[in-house]
């Protein structure tokens, strides 16, 4: 998940285009959906290849770590390429890779296709938020960023549950084929609506030493690593946890995913309303709520209604956290936004991959019932760091 960038980029000449902004928001929806939709399909994919969910879950780790390793190098390699051409090429790779996922007859082939998608993802999130600002109608940059954030949020609300519904009805391969179809339509829309977009404010390797000399920014990146690792230790295995531990039916698991994602919308509203008044309090509160939800995952698994309520608080917590950290990153690195966001995306995906790997190890060694305890313990470490860093953040953001 990635978010807005500052609006200090030059807009395009002309009047801007809401069609382009909407297409970019749809693209954000598609890219976030495909990253996490395997979470809802682990059991089905495992049955296809006669593998355990812990083994299939490593696909999430590989995807995330490819994004993490590729984000900054790909951003630097492509920093001088005209953005419309680059974005269309990214979509071409994305669509072809999803067609390979649809055709996969082995887990190795599926992994190869996911690596192609991950490379497209790495470039996409390094450039897209700044493009939304540039193509927005004059004076409408904030609304454009809001639409992009909405697309990101809707991936959790609708994309992942819809992917599960399609997978349950028609098979997991059709889920990937459907994503390819929607991506192709979005690509054609962008091809028609986007103007030429020369690269701007992309930054360079010279930005890195400067950024890493900012203690508050370094703490932000460490918090991202810890808390996202905690989140995906449990979330990566929520489907097998719900099936095997909570004894919840497939239809109710889809409902849980909808509740989790829908509650994230409320987290976005909380962030919009209170982030300026209580920037650090919102961050600490969201980490504390996340830690509590993860630690209560197993104790509340026996009651569907309590478990559903927990899922909603969990959704609020993780989206509030993600938006808070993105906002801090962009304020602390407004002079090198593309580099800072490429680092953020890479580190976020280190957390996703690390969490999926830790969840796989815990599931294999202790059982899937223990993923909440493991994730919650890591979240508590993040909470302590956030509480200890209050003064550092206030000093850095007051300048």
Swiss-Prot record:
Keywords assigned by UniProt, alphabetized:
Cell inner membrane, Cell membrane, Membrane, Sugar transport, Transmembrane, Transmembrane helix, Transport
For membrane topology, the record states: Multi-pass membrane protein
InterPro entries from the entry? Answer: MFS, MFS_dom, MFS_Efflux_Transporters, MFS_trans_sf, Sugar_effux_transptr_put
Task: Mention any Pfam family matching this sequence.
Answer: MFS_1
The question of whether Lipid biosynthesis is a record keyword is answered with: no
Name the source's superkingdom: Bacteria
**Mainly resides where?**
membrane
Q: Keyword Metal-binding, does the record have it?
A: no
Q: Spell out the molecular function terms from Gene Ontology.
A: carbohydrate transmembrane transporter activity
TM regions (residue ranges): 21-41, 56-76, 87-107, 115-135, 142-162, 176-196, 215-235, 252-272, 281-301, 304-324, 339-359, 366-386
The entry's localization annotation reads: Cell inner membrane
Q: Name one GO cellular component term.
A: plasma membrane
Classification via PANTHER family: PURINE EFFLUX PUMP PBUE (PTHR43124), SUGAR EFFLUX TRANSPORTER (PTHR43124:SF4)
- Role this protein plays: Involved in the efflux of sugars. The physiological role may be the reduction of the intracellular concentration of toxic sugars or sugar metabolites.
Q: Which family does it belong to?
A: Belongs to the major facilitator superfamily. SotB (TC 2.A.1.2) family.
Recorded protein name is Probable sugar efflux transporter
Species of origin reads: Pseudomonas putida (strain W619)
Gene this chain is encoded by: sotB
């Amino acid at each position: 998940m990635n978010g807005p960038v500052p609006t200090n980029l030059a807009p395009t000449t002309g009047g801007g285009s809401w069609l382009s902004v909407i297409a970019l928001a749809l693209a954000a929806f598609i890219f976030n959906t495909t990253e996490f939709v395997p979470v809802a399909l682990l059991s089905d994919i495992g049955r296809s290849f006669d593998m355990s969910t812990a083994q299939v879950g490593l696909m999430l780790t590989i995807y995330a770590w490819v994004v993490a390793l590729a984000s900054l190098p790909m951003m630097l390699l492509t920093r001088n390429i005209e953005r419309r051409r680059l974005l269309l090429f990214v979509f071409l790779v994305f669509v072809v890779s999803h067609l390979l996922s649809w055709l996969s007859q082995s887990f190795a082939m599926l992994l190869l296709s996911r690596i192609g998608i991950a490379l497209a993802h790495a470039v996409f999130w390094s450039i897209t938020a700044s493009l939304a600002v540039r193509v927005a109608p004059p004076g409408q940059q904030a609304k454009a960023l809001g639409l992009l954030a909405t697309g990101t949020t809707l991936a959790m609300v609708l994309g992942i549950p819809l992917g599960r519904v399609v997978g349950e009805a028609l098979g997991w391969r059709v889920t990937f084929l459907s994503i390819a179809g929607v991506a192709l339509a979005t690509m054609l829309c962008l091809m028609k609506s986007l103007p030429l977009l020369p690269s701007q404010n992309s930054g360079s390797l010279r930005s890195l030493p400067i950024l890493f000399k900012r203690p508050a920014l370094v703490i932000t990146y460490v918090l991202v690593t810890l808390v996202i690792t905690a989140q995906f230790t449990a979330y990566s295995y929520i489907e097998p946890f719900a099936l095997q531990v909570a004894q919840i039916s497939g239809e109710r698991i889809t409902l849980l995913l909808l509740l989790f994602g829908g509650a994230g919308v409320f987290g976005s509203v909380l962030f919009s309303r209170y982030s300026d008044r209580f920037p650090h309090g919102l961050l600490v509160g969201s980490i504390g709520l996340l830690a509590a939800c993860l630690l209560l995952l197993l104790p509340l698994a026996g009651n569907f209604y309590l478990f559903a309520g927990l899922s909603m608080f969990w959704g609020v917590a993780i989206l509030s956290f993600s938006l808070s950290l993105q906002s801090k990153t962009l304020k602390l690195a407004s002079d090198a936004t593309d580099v800072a966001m490429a680092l953020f995306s890479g580190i976020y995906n280190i957390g996703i991959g690390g969490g999926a790997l830790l969840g796989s190890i815990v599931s294999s060694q202790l059982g899937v019932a223990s993923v909440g305890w493991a994730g919650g313990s890591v979240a508590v470490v993040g909470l302590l760091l956030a509480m200890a860093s209050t003064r550092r953040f206030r000093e850095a953001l007051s300048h």
